[in-house]
């Protein structure tokens, strides 16, 4: 580029930075090699499936699936992980169904969890936006998109039709939220339900409420489904759950994480350490027996889970070795640069 054109471009960029702040315009190459900043999901299996070691910060995440599949459980584990690293969490309970005792059992510090139970959708999304724009909240969970009922629908009669109201509400909210979420480095998790399209003869009839906006704005979309029941004798104690990464803008998609969700306890950390340990040759399996470093831990997966609960040192050792082998950090992964750099900053 000749000098006159370069001077003209420099002047324009300086004016932009005066008007809109430092970092309003950057060269793409300045960001190459910059590691994605993440926060752990609370599950080493899901961290691995996401490809970057957890949920990317400053992005929108959608978790959807059938009823009682474990969507809220997955989100609560992320909140517990953020809080354990000194972060601040907020929960927008549009369904008015959060169980504080269950949240506490999953490791959530309920005394320091900011909770809102909004009267209507607009209020819930405005509260979420206020939390994000504050820059002081690390994770915001909205449970659920389907329960964000527009004010007009709540104030109307029971039989009134409100075509596309919720979709328009979500579209407008996400247009406002997406930029603020990126700047504040907040992880925003939207939990969603499943509906069926009427009259679909071919293909998948399932869809998610709230229009298409959330599908577009989400960097990660997770589909949560129960695979099978887990039994201890005749008693059903939990579910084997499949979490499929349907969309991923920060790593290759379509990877699947299989976890054990135990009733009243959440994701079994011991269960996933056993499964991943066997896959990665850290835990040895011979028939129904499991052993570590030549020492037998037990016969059958449930017995080995109990062994790991009773021996936290061995559990931590297996966890550390797994994270090292898979290249997953324990906790937050920070970016190399905290703030955007001006094109005119001196090296």
From Swiss-Prot:
GO terms for molecular function: ATP binding; ATP hydrolysis activity; ATP-dependent DNA damage sensor activity; damaged DNA binding; single-stranded DNA binding. It comes from the Bacteria. Residues 338-347 have a biased composition (Basic and acidic residues). Residues 325-347 are annotated as: Disordered. The keyword Cytoplasm applies. One of its GO terms (biological process) is DNA repair. It is found in: Cytoplasm. ATP binds at residues 65-72. InterPro entries: AAA+_ATPase, DNA_recomb/repair_RecA, DNA_recomb/repair_RecA_CS, P-loop_NTPase, RecA-like_C, RecA-like_N, RecA_ATP-bd, RecA_C_sf. The keyword Lipoprotein does not apply. Belongs to the RecA family. Can catalyze the hydrolysis of ATP in the presence of single-stranded DNA, the ATP-dependent uptake of single-stranded DNA by duplex DNA, and the ATP-dependent hybridization of homologous single-stranded DNAs. It interacts with LexA causing its activation and leading to its autocatalytic cleavage. HAMAP family: RecA (MF_00268). This is Protein RecA. It comes from Staphylococcus aureus (strain JH9). The lineage of its organism: Bacteria, Bacillati, Bacillota, Bacilli, Bacillales.
């Amino acid at each position: 580029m000749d000098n006159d054109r370069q001077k003209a471009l420099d002047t324009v960029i300086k004016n932009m930075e005066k008007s809109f702040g430092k970092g309003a315009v950057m060269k793409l190459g300045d960001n190459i090699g910059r590691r994605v900043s993440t926060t752990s999901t609370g599950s080493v299996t899901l961290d691995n499936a996401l490809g970057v070691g957890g949920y990317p910060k400053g992005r929108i995440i959608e978790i959807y699936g059938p009823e009682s599949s474990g969507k809220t459980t997955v989100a609560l584990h992320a909140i517990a992980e953020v809080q354990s690293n000194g972060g601040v969490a907020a929960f927008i309970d549009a369904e008015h169904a959060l169980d504080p005792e269950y949240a506490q059992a999953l490791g959530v510090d309920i005394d320091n969890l900011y909770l809102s139970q909004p009267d209507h959708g607009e209020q819930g999304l405005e509260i979420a936006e206020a939390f994000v724009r504050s820059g002081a909240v690390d994770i915001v969970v909205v449970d659920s998109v389907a329960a964000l009922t527009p004010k007009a629908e709540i104030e109307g009669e029971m039989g009134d039709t409100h075509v596309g109201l919720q979709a328009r509400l979500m579209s407008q909210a996400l247009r406002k939220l997406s930029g603020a979420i990126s700047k504040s480095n907040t992880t925003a998790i939207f939990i969603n339900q499943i509906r069926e399209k009427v009259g679909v003869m071919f293909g998948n009839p399932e869809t998610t409420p709230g229009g298409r906006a959330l599908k577009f704005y989400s960097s990660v979309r997770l589909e949560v489904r129960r695979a099978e029941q887990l039994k201890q004798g005749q008693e059903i104690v939990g579910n084997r759950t499949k979490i499929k990464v349907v969309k991923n803008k920060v790593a290759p998609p379509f990877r699947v994480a299989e976890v054990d969700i135990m009733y009243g306890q959440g994701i079994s950390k011991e269960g996933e350490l056993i499964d991943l340990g066997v896959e990665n040759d850290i835990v040895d399996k011979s028939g129904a027996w499991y052993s570590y470093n030549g020492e037998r831990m037990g016969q059958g997966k449930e017995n080995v889970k109990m062994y790991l609960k009773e021996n936290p040192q061995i559990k931590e050792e297996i966890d550390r070795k797994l994270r090292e082998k898979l290249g997953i950090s324990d906790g937050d992964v920070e970016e190399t640069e905290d703030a955007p750099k001006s094109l005119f900053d001196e090296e």
